[in-house]
A protein has these predicted regions:
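C-terminal motif of bacterial Sec signal peptides marking the signal peptidase cleavage site
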Residues: 22-25
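Bacterial signal peptide processing site
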Residues: 27-29
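Hydrophobic alpha-helical segments within soluble ligand-binding/sensing domains
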Residues: 32, 86, 145-176, 226, ...
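Hinge/cleft segment of the Venus flytrap/periplasmic-binding protein
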Residues: 35, 177-188, 192, 203, ...
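Extracytoplasmic "Venus flytrap"
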Residues: 40-61, 65, 75-88, 98, ...
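Short, solvent-exposed amphipathic alpha-helices that sit
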Residues: 50-65, 153-157, 191-210, 225, ...
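Hydrophobic alpha-helical
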Residues: 58, 103-120, 125, 200, ...
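Flexible loop/hinge segments that line or gate small-molecule binding clefts
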Residues: 114-152, 177, 278-286
Length: 359
């Protein structure tokens, strides 16, 4: 009887061990660990549509890079807007045997724990979308960043807004020679929010648009928060608001929703500009509810991250021609307005059709 119990205990122990590995996200059940790339992806939040679309693209591109010799397992977790929780999720993925980490930081100034844990296990880290401070990224040669130049997005937003305003004098509804504007900012202290805000406004003024600031409001990149902020601003300023600049499309869409609900006729709406090129924003541009966005090329970024992950796993050198300082990959933003909106909507439709056809 004792032998039976011991045998049963061993079997149960083996089963529990297998379950722990499977649930932790990065484990390989095939037993062929030398041919399996385990990629751990950790985002700052599970509620950001752009980040969700980017990680979907990353999974899709990694899937295309599988072969008879190489299997790829992707595990995606969220830090739920808590840096400590994100650190713990990273530790779980490292313990589970991930070979490459892709990290979208909660706090871009606090990557220390993640870098320390990854370095101790010699696991490369590709940070994305939220750029760490340069001093942090340069402290180890297996740290990389994939994203865009926030300054460029601010400049482009200012350019398309200035072009529209200068060719549509009716934007200046009170005909005082100045454009009264509000600005929806991502979050306090976030480098992208700071750069997009600064360069969008500077570029408008550089292009002969006289501005009068009514209000700057933080809405944490969130559509619902932006709608609430805009409702208060509409109550305060009414039709005085002639321009809404938003650090991203989600907040711009919050502004759109506020104006839909308040019941103003379209000529009393301000012109609204966002950044990211989300599908909902593209539809709003087509409908005339927004006047433009800056397309943040998630497809290009996902392709680069997938390529980097496989190359690093294979122990090969990265393509230095595409990297700045050997560590940074920046994809180019693109302007979207009424003149080219169909091109981008068609691209979104083709992408969706392609995903629906995947086995």
């Amino acid at each position: 009887m004792n032998k039976k119990k011991r045998r049963m205990a061993m079997v149960l122990s083996a089963i529990i061990g297998s379950l722990v590995l499977a649930l932790s996200g990065c484990s390989d059940q095939s037993g062929q660990t030398e041919k399996t790339l385990r990629v751990g992806v950790i985002t700052y939040s599970q509620d950001d549509p752009f980040i969700n679309a980017l990680t979907d693209e990353l999974k899709a591109h990694l899937k295309t890079m599988e072969s008879e010799e190489r299997r790829i397992i992707v595990s995606i977790k969220s830090g739920n807007d808590d840096q400590q929780e994100q650190n713990e999720k990273v530790e779980e993925m490292i313990d589970a045997g991930c070979d490459v980490l892709c990290v979208n930081l909660v706090d871009r100034t606090a990557p220390y724990q993640i870098i320390r844990m990854a370095r101790n296990e010699n696991i490369p880290v590709i940070f994305f979308n939220r750029e760490p401070v340069k001093e942090d990224l340069m402290q180890w040669d297996k740290l990389y960043y994939v994203g865009c130049d926030a300054e460029q997005s601010g400049i482009m937003q200012g350019e398309i807004a200035a072009e529209y305003i200068n060719s549509h004098p009716e934007v200046d509804k009170n005909e005082d020679g100045k454009i009264q504007y509000v600005l929806l900012e991502g979050e306090a202290g976030h480098q992208d929010a700071i750069s997009r805000t600064e360069y969008s406004v500077k570029t408008l003024m550089k292009n002969d648009v006289s501005l009068e600031k009514l209000s700057y409001q933080f809405a944490d990149w969130n559509r619902g928060q932006a709608e609430n902020r805009m409702n208060r601003l509409i109550s305060q300023y009414g039709t005085e608001i002639e321009l809404v600049l938003s650090n991203n499309d989600e907040m711009a869409l919050g502004a759109v929703e506020a104006y839909r609900k308040v019941g103003y006729i379209r000529k009393d709406w301000p012109v609204i500009f966002g950044i990211d090129g989300l599908e909902d924003a593209l539809e709003a541009v087509k409908a005339g509810e927004m006047q433009g966005s800056i397309y943040n090329d998630r497809v290009d970024q996902a392709k680069e991250m997938a390529k980097m992950a496989v190359t690093l796993f294979e122990g090969k050198d990265l393509d230095q021609e595409s990297l700045k300082d050997g560590r940074y990959y920046f994809s180019e933003y693109k302007k979207v307005d009424g003149s080219n909106i169909e091109e981008y909507l068609n691209a979104e439709e083709e992408e969706a059709d392609g995903k629906n056809m995947e086995p």
